[in-house]
């Protein structure tokens, strides 16, 4: 059956305009083309490659500039005690830092208590779950300044927390007690770019979206993409080994990062900014800093291999009746789209309901209700070839009744709108009050079962319901199906000890039994430190601690977290 005719049997004429508009664009395309990629698709626009809006329009830090209403981490977890090895801050310490960094490089509430309000955004995380007591934020402007600051802190036993865009989700980028915050926000230089090899060298404080915009002007793209791209720093991305939306196509940062520049706790500058794809000379030490979450040193510079920006990009948003059908769709996508498949995102009905509730005026990608939704992206160099492959795939999955309904972006605006809808889930989840987040990897056949079992667990404890008397409101799941990465989210009206006890270690035990990972891409931070044993055996954890003690014998780097 012809694709257009087949789709015509599925979509009502009255729905077609909404489907074509894909939340924002207004066209007069005939209804018969509502579920196909037209000649005006974003794929035909060379500069449109992955030009979607993320949550960058919402500055993750400054929308919550005052976080004094967040419970202190030390109060939420009273069993945690400040390490007595660390010295308290003094006026003499502050004077030294101002001498090195200048007045503009220091936010000081030690000698100027009125500045505490300016420090609060650095003390709290955007999830409103963790909040420290820091009275000092240092903002070095160069690697050499980072070196001087760290050496002094190490010599005087001052604990530090490296901080990038502070978009982390596990409490890894904010203080627990009175640690000194070392913000990389002033280190924003793009040092060099080779437009033949695609090698980019940047300061750690360069914002991900700024780097991608710079590359777009030169026909390249950054091989990492996430919803926080408008705020997160590349140094933070590397330090947490962020995964994101492009991992299916471009792999992890362990493969794309060519070199790092880092400062060790004793002030030693590690200059390993290799620009070569091949360098088999000795131990690959840069890998230790990728995903170390600032516990071994501070990443100050990154060299990374960037691919050509695809000239042809297509995005489809599909509705499916079950998780089993989503699995079938993914298998077909890998088989039929193969080399042009760049993203395959999974969303359940609960996550979509929350987005619609928080954004009632936003246009929905699909009018009908479905149990599951998938966003599929293809990217390549030949628009005609890619469009034909995508149309053939969609015709096939509709014919096999794998997919119930769907829409394909007709232009750049619609590509942007569909991705914005997907990426808006994270922000919308927090509007009820708070979120317990679990970023996990599970074998695909059982991936969504964790969501259902977690919901059952909370129901059995009487902790979840529609009224305000219940602390938990919703259990939803979404994530990157392309790399078996589930984001399990429990939206709560308030953080509650009973909810946390019901979830932990239940979730981690469930994952461990299926040989999954308790942290797929968000890291360990404070949230998962004590649960690392569910994914790493005693030998592995012991080796990690040996590495930590070798690099940071005084333990000043991001204490109380990771391992």
Residue ranges and their predicted role:
Residues 2-563:
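Noncatalytic alpha-helical scaffold of FAD-dependent oxidoreductases
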């Amino acid at each position: 059956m012809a694709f257009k005719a087949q789709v015509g049997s599925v979509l009502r004429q009255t729905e077609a305009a909404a489907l074509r508009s894909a939340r924002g664009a207004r066209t007069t395309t005939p209804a018969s083309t509502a579920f196909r990629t037209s000649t005006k698709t974003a794929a035909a626009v060379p500069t449109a490659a992955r030009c979607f809006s993320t949550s960058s329009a919402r500055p993750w830090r400054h929308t919550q500039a005052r976080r004094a209403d967040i419970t202190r981490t030390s109060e939420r977890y009273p069993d945690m005690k400040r390490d007595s090895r660390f010295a308290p801050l003094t006026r003499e310490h502050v004077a030294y830092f101002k001498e090195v960094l200048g007045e503009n490089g220091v936010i000081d509430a030690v000698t100027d208590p009125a500045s505490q309000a300016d420090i609060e955004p650095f003390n709290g995380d955007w999830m409103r779950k963790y909040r420290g007591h820091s009275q000092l934020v240092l903002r070095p402007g160069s690697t050499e300044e980072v070196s001087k600051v760290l050496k002094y802190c190490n010599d005087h036993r001052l604990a530090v927390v490296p901080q990038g865009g502070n978009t982390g989700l596990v409490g890894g980028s904010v203080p627990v007690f009175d640690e000194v915050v070392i913000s990389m926000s002033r280190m924003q230089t793009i040092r060099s770019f080779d437009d033949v090899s695609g090698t980019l060298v940047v300061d750690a404080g360069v914002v991900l979206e700024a780097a991608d915009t710079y590359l777009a002007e030169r026909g390249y793209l950054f091989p990492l993409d996430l919803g926080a791209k408008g705020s997160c720093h590349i140094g933070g991305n590397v330090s947490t080994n962020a995964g994101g939306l492009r991992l299916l196509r471009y792999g992890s940062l362990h493969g794309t990062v060519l070199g790092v520049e880092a400062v060790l706790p004793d002030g030693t500058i590690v200059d390993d900014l290799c620009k070569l794809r091949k360098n088999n000379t000795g131990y690959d030490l840069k890998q230790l800093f990728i995903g170390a979450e600032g516990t071994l040193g501070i990443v100050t510079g990154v060299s990374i291999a960037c691919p050509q920006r695809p000239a042809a990009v297509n995005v489809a948003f599909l509705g499916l009746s079950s998780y089993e059908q989503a699995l079938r769709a993914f298998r077909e996508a890998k088989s039929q789209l193969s080399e042009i498949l760049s993203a395959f995102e999974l969303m359940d009905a609960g996550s979509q309901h929350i987005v619609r509730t928080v954004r009632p005026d936003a246009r929905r990608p699909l009018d009908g209700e479905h149990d599951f939704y998938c966003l599929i992206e293809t990217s390549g160099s030949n628009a005609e070839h890619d469009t034909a492959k995508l149309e053939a795939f969609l015709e096939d999955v509709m014919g096999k009744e794998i997919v119930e309904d769907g829409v394909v972006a007709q232009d750049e605006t619609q590509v942007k709108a569909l991705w914005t809808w997907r990426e808006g889930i994270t922000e919308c989840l927090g509007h009820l009050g708070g979120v317990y987040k679990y970023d996990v990897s599970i074998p695909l056949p059982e991936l969504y079962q964790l969501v259902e079992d977690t919901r059952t667990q909370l129901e059995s404890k009487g902790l979840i319901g529609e009224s305000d008397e219940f602390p938990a409101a919703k259990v939803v799941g979404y994530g990157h199906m392309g790399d078996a990465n589930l984001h399990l989210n429990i939206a709560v009206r308030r953080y509650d000890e009973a909810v946390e006890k019901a979830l932990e270690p239940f979730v981690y035990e469930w994952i461990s039994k299926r040989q999954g990972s308790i942290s797929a891409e968000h890291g360990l931070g404070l949230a998962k430190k004590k649960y690392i044993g569910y994914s790493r055996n005693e030998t592995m954890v012991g080796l990690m601690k040996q590495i930590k003690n070798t690099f940071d014998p005084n333990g000043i780097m991001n204490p109380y977290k990771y391992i």
